[in-house]
UniProtKB/Swiss-Prot annotation:
Enzymatic reactions: NAD(+) + (deoxyribonucleotide)n-3'-hydroxyl + 5'-phospho-(deoxyribonucleotide)m = (deoxyribonucleotide)n+m + AMP + beta-nicotinamide D-nucleotide
Name of the coding gene: ligB
GO BP terms in the entry: DNA repair; DNA replication
Organism in which the protein naturally occurs: Yersinia pseudotuberculosis serotype IB (strain PB1/+)
PANTHER family, alphabetized: DNA LIGASE, DNA LIGASE B
Protein name, UniProt field: DNA ligase B
NCBIfam families (alphabetical): PRK08097.1
MF (Gene Ontology): DNA ligase (NAD+) activity
Enzyme Commission no: 6.5.1.2
Signal sequence, start to end: none
Length: 567
């Protein structure tokens, strides 16, 4: 084992291995008429073309590569649903340039996963892996050793002339001694970084920074911080060893330093993981695997070639498709909007629902079924909506329910009509960790009690017998007895927990009994530590509400701790 391989293995032992996240749900065809899916395909295809043109012509795009790639995958699915061929890899890059490349830029086809990598590598030999440097693709043209052209990639056939910027980029040799009479190189202009770790820092907008400096009319001081990574030498030496050695002699050291021979897909996996974690002088977004054998430059076209492939890192942003929109009423009478999405895996967690807050916020986001959103995991693994990246062309109108009559003191009972959602939310809170913490009792169980009309108010479950509980389909006698005993033990829960379970707006510990709490005046509450005038009013409104007092009276008859009548 050579020293370099040993270094890699040791590095991996002390580093986190890449977790492949962001898996899309199993691709299925949308339940749309043929006419609509044709419209949606056309709209998405046009948008992707606009973003692609911005990327290749201007060096930046309104969306990240992660988002672009995932939406391109979605386009492929939709096209396959209509029996259309996959044109995403062979489609020419949109846009025009003025200056002809001596050899076309081929671009890279992206491998989906390790299985695709293994399949592509099978039967190929003399393979090498390099970091996929995230920068601005260019052509360097030398005549007699002198740099005569620096061209942007453009559409792969023609690009912009940036030659006047070359003297300000010290990483580009202006003259190469003993160079071939005609030398054409293709590579990446990148922002020089100091120990950049892709896994920790991501892309940091490096490519757009370089593109902006190159497109300015006057030379930017930033050009002094630009490096170059040569990844193609059309019609150059036949072996990679000779190629990288000569490039180093000519003044392009990065190619030699970051090109490694690979024998199997496991070698590629190892280097990909290493470069994802390791401090590097540039931003990367994956690796490129290439074979030594290439066609002559005259055969290169502005479409992905078959002699090199990209395998990108797991996406930092994850796209989900909105399947449906649900409106829920919380225990305090506040409505929230929950997006149901096609299942997506982020890290080790499958995401199916995303709470986005109030109806007002939903309207501001302007989200409809079929839209594509980006998600991330916030604290405790809770999914968070980050952005809407694609809106379907045909938008179905959805009307939110009217919740004006609901508030913090409504729906302590199942009736009147319309109360069931808030009533159910109250029950879920009551049995949850913020209330009485009754193990194994959640929304599904309470929903069954409501459905079978076995409960009509927030504490009516205390009257249920084991036989009544067992009458619910799916609950046998043994489980019914266990639930009954849990309910009876709940009577001994501390008084403060019962207050919380009922919805008391508590911000301080309340250890007194119900009768004592009830007799406190507004001013007494307001002067207690941690309670101001506003919260004191909320507490008094809660304590004086007829429904709350009726619940307290019932709990007194059940001899619940803290609610017993005192002489």
């Amino acid at each position: 084992m050579n020293i370099l391989n040993l270094k890699i293995i040791m590095f991996l032992l002390i580093s986190n291995i890449i977790v492949v996240g962001g898996a899309w749900a199993t691709s299925t065809c949308p339940d749309w008429p043929a006419t609509r899916i044709a419209v949606e395909i056309n709209a998405l295809e046009q948008q992707l073309n606009k973003w692609s043109a911005a990327y290749h012509q201007q060096g930046h795009s309104p969306v990240t590569d992660d988002i672009y790639d995932q939406l391109q995958d979605k386009l492929r699915v939709w096209q396959s649903c209509r029996g259309l061929p996959d044109k995403t890899e062979s489609q020419p890059i949109p846009g025009k340039g003025q200056f002809l490349h001596p050899v076309a830029h081929t671009g890279l086809k992206k491998l989906k996963d390790e299985t695709a990598l293994t399949r592509w590598m099978a039967g190929r030999k003399n393979l090498w892996v390099q970091p996929k440097v995230d920068g601005v693709a260019v052509t360097l043209v030398y005549h007699g050793g002198k740099l005569v052209q620096l061209l942007s990639r453009g559409n792969g056939v023609k690009g912009q002339n940036w030659t006047e910027k070359a003297p300000f980029i010290s990483a580009i040799p202006q003259y190469i001694a003993n160079a071939p009479a005609l030398l054409t190189l293709q590579g990446e202009l990148f922002l020089l970084m100091d120990g950049h770790q892709q896994a920790k820092s991501g892309g940091v907008n490096a490519r757009s920074t370089v593109a902006g400096a190159l497109m300015r009319k006057s030379p930017s001081p930033l050009l002094a911080q630009v490096g170059v990574f040569i990844w193609a030498w059309p019609d150059g030496p036949t072996t990679m060893k000779e190629k990288v050695a000569l490039l180093q002699v000519m003044g392009f050291p990065f190619t030699a330093k970051y090109s490694e021979p690979v024998m199997s897909h496991l070698d590629v996996v190892q280097w990909r993981q290493f470069w994802f974690q390791a401090p590097l002088p540039f931003v990367t977004d994956g690796v490129v695997v290439r074979q030594e054998e290439e066609p002559a430059g005259r055969y290169w076209q502005a479409t992905p070639g078959q002699w090199s492939m990209a395998w990108k890192y797991p996406p930092l942003q994850h796209i989900a498709e909105v399947k449906d929109i649900h409106f829920t009423l919380g225990r305090t009478g506040k409505g929230t909007v929950v997006l149901e999405v096609l299942p997506i895996k982020i890290d080790d967690k499958w995401i199916r629902r995303v709470n986005i807050g109030s109806v007002t916020r939903w309207k501001q986001w302007d989200i409809a079924p079929g839209d594509h959103i980006t998600l991330a995991l916030a604290g405790h693994g809770i999914p968070r909506l980050d952005n809407v990246v694609w809106r379907v062309h045909q938008r179905n109108t959805i009307t939110a329910p009217n919740w004006d009559k609901f508030h913090q003191l409504s729906c302590f009972q199942r009736l009147p009509h319309g109360c069931e959602p808030q009533f159910l939310s109250r029950l879920i809170w009551l049995s949850g960790p913020g209330g009485l913490d009754i193990g194994g009792i959640g929304g599904g169980f309470w929903q069954k009690l409501i459905h079978h009309e076995l409960i009509n108010d927030l504490v009516g479950w205390l009257l249920l017998t084991p036989e009544q509980i067992a009458s619910i389909p799916g609950i046998g006698n043994a489980r019914a007895e266990k639930i009954y005993q849990q309910f009876q033990r709940a009577k001994q829960q501390p008084f403060s927990r019962w207050l919380l379970a009922l919805g008391f707006p508590q911000v301080v510990s309340v250890d007194a009994q119900w009768q004592v709490v009830l007799r406190r005046s507004l001013s007494e509450w307001a002067t207690m530590a941690g309670i101001g005038q506003m919260r004191a009013k909320q507490i008094k409104h809660f304590l004086d509400h007829p429904d709350v007092q009726a619940l307290a009276d019932f709990l007194s008859t059940q001899k619940v701790v803290g609610f017993e009548l005192t002489e």
